[in-house]
């Protein structure tokens, strides 16, 4: 444990930020998982869940939790997953 007052404060701040970031990452993972399940089962609300997942990813990007390239990659992969399930196999 740190003995210096400023380091104690910075550790506390880092712990709060880590908890906040982990909560945001968890929301993103849950939204993606729900969207993928809806796409796989061809649920009626799949477009809403895809939009919600895109929104959560964009929020994480704007808050600095995800790098812009990582956020774009996640969105792209979700769209690719949706397109492979919705287009008929030829």
UniProtKB/Swiss-Prot annotation:
Keywords assigned: Ribonucleoprotein, Ribosomal protein, RNA-binding, rRNA-binding
Q: Which Gene3D superfamilies match?
A: Ribosomal protein S20
User: Which InterPro entries does the record associate with it?
Assistant: Ribosomal_bS20, Ribosomal_bS20_sf
User: In the record, what terms sit under GO molecular function?
Assistant: small ribosomal subunit rRNA binding; structural constituent of ribosome
Entry keyword Chloroplast: no
Establish whether keyword NAD is in the entry. no
Gene Ontology biological process terms from the UniProt entry:
translation
What GO CC terms are in its UniProt record?
Answer: cytosol; small ribosomal subunit
The family this protein is said to belong to: Belongs to the bacterial ribosomal protein bS20 family.
- Which function does this protein serve? Binds directly to 16S ribosomal RNA.
What is the protein's name according to its record?
A: Small ribosomal subunit protein bS20
The protein's organism comes out as: Mesomycoplasma hyopneumoniae (strain 7448) (Mycoplasma hyopneumoniae)
């Amino acid at each position: 444990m740190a003995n210096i007052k400023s380091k104690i404060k910075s550790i506390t701040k880092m712990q709060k930020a880590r908890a906040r970031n982990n909560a945001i990452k968890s929301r993103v993972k849950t939204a993606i998982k729900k969207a993928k399940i809806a796409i796989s089962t061809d649920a009626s609300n799949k477009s809403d869940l895809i939009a919600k997942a895109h929104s959560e990813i964009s929020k994480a990007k704007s808050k600095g939790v995800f790098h812009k390239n990582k956020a774009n990659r996640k969105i792209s992969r979700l769209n690719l997953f949706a397109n492979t399930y919705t287009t008929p196999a030829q």
